[in-house]
Amino acid sequence: MTKTTAQIAPVATLDHLVVAATTLADGIEYIAEVMGVVPQPGGKHVAMATHNALVRLSERTYLEIIAIDPAGARPSRPRWFGLDDIALQAELIERPRLIHWVARATDIARRAAACPIALGPVHVMARGDYRWRIT
């Protein structure tokens, strides 16, 4: 007997989509124009010197608008999603862009170790009181 798709637990599920912009204000304005909804304030990712705004898409999925926080201290490592990349920064001057997606998984360390491509170490991140782990 084989399991149906509904019986197989997913390894990971979509958590959120990431739209990057040169400034958070530009990203919020762009999403308001194209989606007809105004993103809500998110917060600051101090370790990455980024800040964001959010649009809820479903019960457990959202759209994140992210930009480098000009008030933040430059991080000791490259910012996530390639935000420090000069080519990406040039593209974002033209308009904000959908640049990434993020999956939610249980036991991220085990999942990352089992991945056929190197995902890098698991880091604990925070935005205000909210904490999560990411590779």
Report residues per predicted region.
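Active-site-proximal cofactor/substrate-binding loop regions of enzyme domains
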Residues: 2-65, 69-74
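Vicinal oxygen chelate
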Residues: 2-3, 12-23, 43, 51-67, 74-113, ...
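Generic signature of intrinsically disordered, low-complexity segments enriched in small/polar residues
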Residues: 33, 65, 83-84, 133
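Glycine-centered loop/turn motif at secondary-structure junctions
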Residues: 35-36, 80, 116
